Amino acid sequence: MDVNPTLLFLKVPAQNAISTTFPYTGDPPYSHGTGTGYTMDTVNRTHQYSERGRWTKNTETGAPQLNPIDGPLPEDNEPSGYAQTDCVLEAMAFLEESHPGIFENSCIETMEVVQQTRVDKLTQGRQTYDWTLNRNQPAATALANTIEVFRSNGLMANESGRLIDFLKDVMESMDKEEIEITTHFQRKRRVRDNVTKKMVTQRTIGKKKQRLNKRSYLIRALTLNTMTKDAERGKLKRRAIATPGMQIRGFVYFVETLARSICEKLEQSGLPVGGNEKKAKLANVVRKMMTNSQDTEISFTITGDNTKWNENQNPRMFLAVITYITRNQPEWFRNILSIAPIMFSNKMARLGKGYMFESKSMKLRTQISAEMLANIDLKYFNDSTRKKIEKIRPLLIDGTASLSPGMMMGMFNMLSTVLGVSILNLGQKRYTKTTYWWDGLQSSDDFALIVNAPNHAGIQAGVDRFYRTCKLLGINMSKKKSYINRTGTFEFTSFFYRYGFVANFSMELPSFGVSGINESADMSIGVTVIKNNMINNDLGPATAQMALQLFIKDYRYTYRCHRGDTQIQTRRSFEIKKLWEQTRSKAGLLVSDGGPNLYNIRNLHTPEVCLKWELMDEDYQGRLCNPLNPFVSHKEIESVNNAVMMPAHGPAKNMEYDAVATTHSWVPKRNRSILNTSQRGILEDEQMYQRCCNLFERFFPSSSYRRPVGISSMVEAMVSRARIDARIDFESGRIKKEDFTEIMKICSTIEELRRQK
């Protein structure tokens, strides 16, 4: 039977049909090879936008720097980064006038945070540029390496464990004439294998000491490493993103804390909230503009797009903003907040791996590292690459490019949002002093502008004024990519508004299905995604029920765990059938053990083990959840776990799901190939780090574990704790006298060894 597709929409309001326009099926594109070209593009573009600024030279590193601040006012519509300090400060002053006490209060909140934050805050985050090894590392390892180097160079303030004291060490490290670091290197040698009698290459990892003079150290401390951004949809070209080192991270964190505190108090800010809270905040602004425009005014909304937001921002300008916001605060606080923008004004961009050349005729491949680009003959490169290299050469020092203007992606999202909101704030009638006025929403570089005026000419004048005001602050609204509509229909941060925010369910499609973590987590995540979409994305009961059935089917095919009474033959069916036959209460078997599915849309919030617990055979319960069963993983399992969900568009979301530790919550083993590479030394460091932390937690169970305050080391804390516990256990008769004496002896030995060290 043929169905006329328009019939499907008869009962559906037009705006709900947005889910049918979904273009993003299939996998997103990933980048391969080197990111050097993209990074050079970023550096060259950023300098081009500020080309009429003033050139200076950094006295410490010798890096050439371009300063566009207070540069010539733009005469055309090309993007430019010539922010005017006085305009920026005035916008900030008006923002404060409209929100009395906002900066003052945020400073007080931030000061409290600054004094309480522990240095382990910096272990959050994925890849971090590790300046000691000159490449990316997991954040925790990079921090450990930095602290280790600091201590071996006599910088000890970090021992208190407070982030602010670690930052004191960072400041001091920059004054040192030289810094000694430990780096890893690789030795290769050919040896004969005893068993196969063949020659094999054996790699050994060594650690060696290396001295960096002040200039080399400063360059590393100011370096942002670059990578290619992966999985970006809807773009033909890839682009580079930056990851800063540990010296910069702490300072950025405090600046963003202050800016976040300000954003929370601004009704036009789309950060730091998300989800339904964000939608409510935005709907308020729209409602305000629409109620005020009913009779005499017309109202239009621009779905805005800015050209190269962060390449036109400037750290020097952020310094002015911070100086203004903190103007009545204590000196130490102002200093600590001004360091991040100062470091960014002197930043260096690491160019990545360099280029790979291969000769088809001679079957040769060779790597041209970024360090070699400064003086290699350009005849080997194609035209476009040659132009890039010629342009970037004057900026190169040791394989990094001096990049003073521009902010790099994602570094100061909150602070740049404050800047954007300060322009939206200027749209009030008391500032425009005319018949048009505006308001809007800002979330990092994304904005929506709502303009009200008596007639179309007024709307046009309002938009023009907004556009020019933006230019004065180094923000470039793209006339090509922004579009205007009657208020009531616009898009902001992938939320589509049409008389209210429309649920764009298709965005969530990629997160339906089996995640591939393990049987336990996948079941839990799968039903949680369906539950969340019923709550947040207008997923109706019938569709949810269908989604659930499809998910169970998908899950059974993935893990080959079809019901015990099915005819489908898989590798597991022999075991599953055997279990099915010897189980009395078949309803109690988990789906992953060939049991039936008991989920429906009413009980999605219950973990499967809990749902079926009462129905399980006793011996099955005992095998499934017995802590003594070697297959029950208790290593990583908390009662709540986090999964990272990737929607089709927009940022990855963190999603909590219930985790019940069973034989199905296995954790896959680390790939063995890492053990033969230069990463091996790092892996050993990481395991050592992990062991120490686990040991420490044995001594201090979570209930009694307070973060150590004062300067006692972990070892001292554990020894004194062991002594106290041993005495209590001995006096209450839980341990014998000889055990007690033994423990005391071990404690004394440990202390003795520490003294000798």
UniProtKB/Swiss-Prot annotation:
It comes from Influenza A virus (strain A/Beijing/11/1956 H1N1). A motif (Nuclear localization signal) lies at residues 187-195, 203-216. GO terms for cellular component: host cell cytoplasm; host cell nucleus. This is RNA-directed RNA polymerase catalytic subunit. Keywords: Eukaryotic host gene expression shutoff by virus, Eukaryotic host transcription shutoff by virus, Host cytoplasm, Host gene expression shutoff by virus, Host nucleus, Host-virus interaction, Inhibition of host RNA polymerase II by virus, Nucleotide-binding, Nucleotidyltransferase, Phosphoprotein, RNA-directed RNA polymerase, Transferase, Viral RNA replication, Viral transcription. Belongs to the influenza viruses polymerase PB1 family. Disulfide bonds: none annotated. It is found in: Host nucleus; Host cytoplasm. Its main location: host cell. Influenza RNA polymerase is composed of three subunits: PB1, PB2 and PA. Interacts (via N-terminus) with PA (via C-terminus). Interacts (via C-terminus) with PB2 (via N-terminus); this interaction is essential for transcription initiation. Interacts (via C-terminus) with human PKP2 (via N-terminus); the interaction competitively inhibits the interaction between the RNA polymerase subunits PB1 and PB2. Residues 249-256 are annotated as: Promoter-binding site. It catalyses: RNA(n) + a ribonucleoside 5'-triphosphate = RNA(n+1) + diphosphate. Residues 286-483 form the RdRp catalytic domain. Residues 50-82 are annotated as: Disordered. Phosphorylated by host PRKCA. Its EC number is 2.7.7.48. The lineage of its organism: Viruses, Riboviria, Orthornavirae, Negarnaviricota, Polyploviricotina. One of its GO terms (biological process) is DNA-templated transcription. RNA-dependent RNA polymerase which is responsible for replication and transcription of virus RNA segments. The transcription of viral mRNAs occurs by a unique mechanism called cap-snatching. 5' methylated caps of cellular mRNAs are cleaved after 10-13 nucleotides by PA. In turn, these short capped RNAs are used as primers by PB1 for transcription of viral mRNAs. During virus replication, PB1 initiates RNA synthesis and copy vRNA into complementary RNA (cRNA) which in turn serves as a template for the production of more vRNAs.
